[in-house]
């Protein structure tokens, strides 16, 4: 956990500012949080029963992202973040539900002085994210709960294929800050719904996003990316294993279905990037 990031944090129990002392974060009311040797810190306010990504899911996602298959998405995200920031480069970028830190690391390359903080409920993901970039820090946090950040701490927030809590994101963003949300389109990975039992993207996802954000944010821009991925059998397995569909899959049956597909299978990547500003 970088000391430059600690100044943006607050205690999840009492909301007092957190300070760094040796390998411990503490607030004035005596709440303490040890920094793990891998560099992340657990800032959960209370235990959660929500399912977080497992070690296997995180490993599959890391392998797929590192392979470059999702590079069109990551590069478009970085470019959109750069354009949204304009002349005022952010000093603090928060990735909410950011997983392994792959996307945050690329965005940080656009802003040479920015500090990055990734929040996720998955400890295996946060552990990886702590070393995703020299200016990235990470913490275990429930993104549905009160976020462990001070009011107006962040200049930019990322939310890529992840849950979001609009009132809390609004609170932690400064006036004039940027929220960048990436959501799947109806045809995203559609070729794998029947072939491999992938969960289907729900109808009217964009409309629900707009309704969810409306009381707290104004959408000021939107871009779409649609491209074709050419995935081998290993990559197909990782696509399934890294997401919620993996909870419902029998590994042997999945392997059998993948083996029946062509050696290189064309799959649609289709997403929307929505740029938002907090409402007064």
Curated annotation (Swiss-Prot):
Catalyzed reactions: guanosine(748) in 23S rRNA + S-adenosyl-L-methionine = N(1)-methylguanosine(748) in 23S rRNA + S-adenosyl-L-homocysteine + H(+)
UniProt-listed GO biological process terms: rRNA base methylation
GO molecular function: 23S rRNA (guanine(748)-N(1))-methyltransferase activity; metal ion binding
Keywords in alphabetical order: Metal-binding, Methyltransferase, rRNA processing, S-adenosyl-L-methionine, Transferase, Zinc
InterPro entries: Methyltransf_25, RlmA_N, rRNA_m1G-MeTrfase_A_prd, SAM-dependent_MTases_sf
EC number(s) stated in the UniProt entry for this protein: 2.1.1.188
Enzyme class: transferase
Disulfide bond annotation, renumbered to this chain: none
Pfam family, one: Zn_ribbon_RlmA
Residues the record lists as binding Zn(2+): 11, 14, 27, 31
Binding site for S-adenosyl-L-methionine: 70, 100-101, 188
Family: Belongs to the methyltransferase superfamily. RlmA family.
Biological function: Specifically methylates the guanosine in position 748 of 23S rRNA. Confers resistance to the macrolide antibiotic tylosine.
UniProt name for this protein: 23S rRNA (guanine(748)-N(1))-methyltransferase
Biological source species: Streptomyces fradiae
